[in-house]
A protein has these predicted regions:
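Internal nucleotide-binding/catalytic subdomain
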Residues: 4-121
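Active-site-proximal flexible loops/turns
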Residues: 47, 122, 134, 138
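A short beta-strand motif that forms the metal-chelation/ATP-contact edge
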Residues: 51, 122-132
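Active-site "cap" helix and flanking loop/linker of ATP-utilizing ligase/carboxylase catalytic domains
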Residues: 93-114, 129-172
Length: 172
């Protein structure tokens, strides 16, 4: 999740963020490696992508809009909406970028959850992971697809194509 993700624009903010994240890590698991990943903040509108891979082919189950700005310093997610109100060419760019990211890290089969930001320079992948979406968002997929997320994932695990179409049913 976004626990421990803190935006820091200046060195004093970075120092305070490191102390805070180290406390979170120590509380979560005192034996865990306390390495911290520091990344550049990418401005833009954020989307989540849920899909499945079958023999390396990516099939999108849904794109979720994150309509509330996630500009920090903390990144609490409040609501996901699907389908997003975006142009067809932007949807295509998001899906192509996620598929390329999956190939780049060697993912070929199973569920995919990705998060992207879109700005004037293009689509930026923030995360791509071989897992399903968390929280209550799986229920949104059922509303949009007519199948439960579990049914789709089990079918994919058995080697069947997901063969689902998002009928455009709004959910959020």
């Amino acid at each position: 999740g976004s626990r421990g993700v803190i935006r820091a624009d200046h060195i004093n903010e970075l120092s305070a963020a490191i102390v805070r994240v180290q406390r979170i890590l120590k509380r979560e698991n005192p034996h865990l490696d306390r390495s911290i990943l520091i990344e550049k903040f990418i401005e833009g509108h954020e989307y989540a992508v849920e899909g499945v891979l079958c023999s390396g082919e990516f099939q999108c189950l849904a794109i979720f809009d994150k309509p509330d700005p996630l500009d920090g310093p903390y990144f609490e997610e409040t609501i996901y909406l699907t389908p997003p109100d975006i142009r067809n060419d932007l949807e295509t760019d998001i899906l192509k970028t996620v598929a390329i990211a999956c190939r780049a890290i060697g993912l070929t089969h199973g569920p995919i959850h990705a998060e992207c930001r879109v700005n004037s320079k293009g689509v930026w992948v923030l995360e791509v992971a071989p897992r399903t979406i968390g929280g209550q968002c799986g229920r949104l997929l059922e509303l949009a697809l007519g199948l439960s997320l579990e049914e789709v994932i089990m079918s994919n695990a058995l080697g069947h194509s997901a063969c689902v179409e998002n009928d455009g049913q709004a959910a959020g």
